Amino acid sequence: MDQFIKQDETGDLIETGMNVANHFLSAPIQGTNSLSKASIIPGVAPVLIGNPEQKNIQHPTASHQGSKSKGRGSGVRSITVPPPEAGNGGTQIPEPLFAQTGQGGIVTTVHQDPTIQPTGSYRSVELAKIGKERMINRFVEKPRTSTPVTEFKRGGPGAAAQGQTIQEEGIDGNGASAGSKERSGSLSGATLYAHLSLPQQDSTPANVGIAPQSATSANEIMDLLRGMDARLQHLEQKVDKVLAQGSMVTQIKNELSTVKTTLATIEGMMATVKIMDPGNPTGVPVDELRRSFSDHVTIVSGPGDVSFSSSEEPTLYLDELARPVSKPRPAKQTKPQPVKDLAGRKVMITKMITDCVANPQMKQAFEQRLAKASTEDALNDIKRDIIRNAI
């Protein structure tokens, strides 16, 4: 199904709606059953019997009555009005105004006793007539009388306009008032009838001179603003550089923390090594200690058990100090020192000279000393001097 309506179909729908509205507006409005039961003033009900509007009451058709008569009683019923009580006499009313209807849409025909004269007051009848007319005219459009609009003229309204009176429109019922259509009498502000002021012919003209220029002050202010702007940009650049170094500062802090942790670990390991190898506090070489624990001759004087003495060497000898010994000690032979490989150390010292010595003359002197060095002590002296020179 197409959800969009074409323009031609829209125009046909609008035209059909306008025709229906015009049909209902042009049809006459019947004033039957205009007043409800609560709107009738007590004492006036008997005089409202026999209203000519009963002619306009349309009785329902047979089909309509059949649809409504299911489960109900049909139709039209007659009611006879009883005579009024004594003491309610008044002026006779020539004609009644309304017919009465029953409840639930059932039309009730009212018959009047010919012996009964309608009673009531003219004031009540007039009020009922006014209410009837207002209820009927409420739904009928009437041409409104337009209020004459006063044309505004400078100097106040004319004599003809002053004599006119403004007629206010009433609401004539319960409808809303459209308001007054009078235009405002003043079109030039709050002062309604202000007289024009005539120019003064004998006035003295004022002397007019050239206003001094202030371009110099403006230039000075602009130069000052430009200087402040330049300084502000310079400060912003410096702040940007400082903020850019923030990551580098954080990295340096992290590396410093790592170095501190490593240094603490090395110090702990060095303390452990010192505890495990406390060194030689006496300063006695190990060879001498071993020599003191070697075998030697023991002289026992006096009687005693000599079974522990060895029988293999019964001969005693005297040493160079005339001390008795079982066997003379052989002459001590010095062991030849092993020749150490100094080539690796020389290569290391050469690299130290190249990296740590910046002065060419000092570098040449260290190279000459390294070429002449042939012992480990000489190489250690050269290395020590290189470190001192670098510091």
From Swiss-Prot:
The modification Phosphothreonine is found at T10, T16, T91, T150, T165, T250, T258, T282, T298, T375. Keywords: Coiled coil, Phosphoprotein, Viral RNA replication, Virion. The modification Phosphoserine is found at S69, S188, S257, S292, S294, S301, S374. It is found in: Virion. Residues 54-98, 145-186 are annotated as: Disordered. Residues 343-391 are annotated as: Interaction with the nucleoprotein. CDD domains: MEV_P-protein-C_like. InterPro entries: P/V_Pprotein_paramyxoviral. Residues 54-65 have a biased composition (Polar residues). Its main location: virion. Residues 218-245 form a coiled coil. The keyword Transmembrane does not apply. Belongs to the rubulavirus/avulavirus P protein family. The N-terminus consists of a long intrinsically disordered tail. The central part contains the coiled-coil multimerization domain (MD or OD). Forms a four-stranded coiled coil structure. The C-terminus constitutes the alpha-helical X domain (XD) that binds to the nucleocapsid (N-RNA complex) and the L polymerase. Essential cofactor of the RNA polymerase L that plays a central role in the transcription and replication by forming the polymerase complex with RNA polymerase L and recruiting L to the genomic N-RNA template for RNA synthesis. Also plays a central role in the encapsidation of nascent RNA chains by forming the encapsidation complex with the nucleocapsid protein N (N-P complex). Acts as a chaperone for newly synthesized free N protein, so-called N0, allowing encapsidation of nascent RNA chains during replication. Homotetramer. Interacts (via multimerization domain) with polymerase L; this interaction forms the polymerase L-P complex. Interacts (via N-terminus) with N0 (via Ncore); this interaction allows P to chaperon N0 to avoid N polymerization before encapsidation. Interacts (via C-terminus) with N-RNA template; this interaction positions the polymerase on the template for both transcription and replication. Interacts with host RPS6KB1 kinase; this interaction may play a role in the viral replication and transcription. This is Phosphoprotein. It comes from Mumps virus genotype N (strain L-Zagreb vaccine). The lineage of its organism: Viruses, Riboviria, Orthornavirae, Negarnaviricota, Haploviricotina.
